[in-house]
Amino acid sequence: MADSSSYAAKPWIDHYDYWVQPHMNYPRRPLGEILKLTASAIPDRPATAFLGASLTWAEVKERSDRLGTALVRFGIAKGDRVGIMLPNCPQYLIAAFAILRIGGIVVNVNPLYTPREIGVVAADSGMRLLITLDLLAPNALAVRGQTAIEAIMITSAGEQSVAAVPCPAVEGTQRLSDVLANVTETNMPNVSIDPESDVAVLQYTGGTTGVPKGAMLTHYNIFANVIQTTVLHHPDQKRGEERILLVIPYFHIYGFTVGLMAGTWQGAQQILIPKYDVEALLTAIRDFRPTYFPAVPTIYVSILNHPKAREYGIDKVRAFNCGSAPLPLEVIDQFERMTGGTLNEGYGLSEASPVTHTTPSLSRRKPGSIGIPLPDTDIKIVDLVSGLNAVAPGAEGELCIAGPQIMKGYWKRHDETAGALRKDEQGRVWL
């Protein structure tokens, strides 16, 4: 795959916001250290806001360490897959870091999946344990016998709410609260993790075939994408002082990387909305004054159409980001006039951890554009026939992307990995 001079020159760098560097050093450290570093730096700052209750970073780490200890006692070891099938809630944050800290692999599972869909992901990944809601326990139990799932841990939204409603018991499952209560002393193992080769997350994607495939995202892939996306934020942001409003789900890689991981890296309080409702969203904006709000087009349109959106103080949100689908330019213009903030668009895919492109905050937007590549992200358009030869800018072709965020491959799918990832003459891997 030969580079053309047009792409090799990387003309998009000239359009970066003034504070964004085109090249950076990315941590070659396990993802689990993100929580450890933040909890050490700002232990008493708020980490979450959920149904009237909150946790500090020290509390999140303490509970995550207890769960990690429990998982080790259960027999979960490095490389074992553990599923999380939850809406946005503090338990997701706690579980994800517990799994990562002991070298396990997080398998994100959509809570809206049917038993058949859960079974497909569970069987393909070989997950040994699934953490889910009490209300979803019947779906999980329905597939347990046909998969490698050995145990199901349940929790409830009410457990982490201000009312602290206990999770009801469900036969055939273990309550997460009981599991944590049984750990009186944490004993996290010292697991050797190679960030560039060890998988952190299996993110299932149907792609164009409709057959779920697990994109293997390494610790390095996701950590790099966290750095790539957070450097885009205005430089006056301060660690522990920001608030990110999260209605985009953690189980989607957009929410997992940009919300859960990047939010933790920045020490931002994560204001969690478990299910989208425009009134609940606007109420959260009024009560918490988030500084950053990533979402999808339908959410921004619903806010724009709300007759009293301004009364909730939406103009206090500093930055908005839209992903998953393009926004009409008129919607962007109307939204920015209403809020006074900046609404950036981005592009990505599960196989890229996921963000690869974004629109700069200060540059003029081009209608219909997905934006420009992130730092250290190269792109080229290749012809549709061979899929190898770069075409001239403006010509029709297939987008190819290279960068530190590109996946390791598809789980147990060597042929499809070979078809999706290709090396150039310099040995660089392109998606």
Model-derived features: positions:
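Conserved AMP-binding/adenylate-forming core of the ANL superfamily
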Residues: H23-R28, K36, D44-C89, L93-F97, ...
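Conserved ATP-binding/catalytic segment of the ANL
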Residues: R29, F74, M85, A392-G394, ...
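Adenylate-forming
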Residues: T38, T48, V60, S64-L67, ...
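Conserved adenylate-forming
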Residues: L71-I76, T186-S197, L202-L245, Q266-A268, ...
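Conserved AMP-binding/adenylation subdomain of ANL enzymes
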Residues: F223-R243, F251-T291, H306
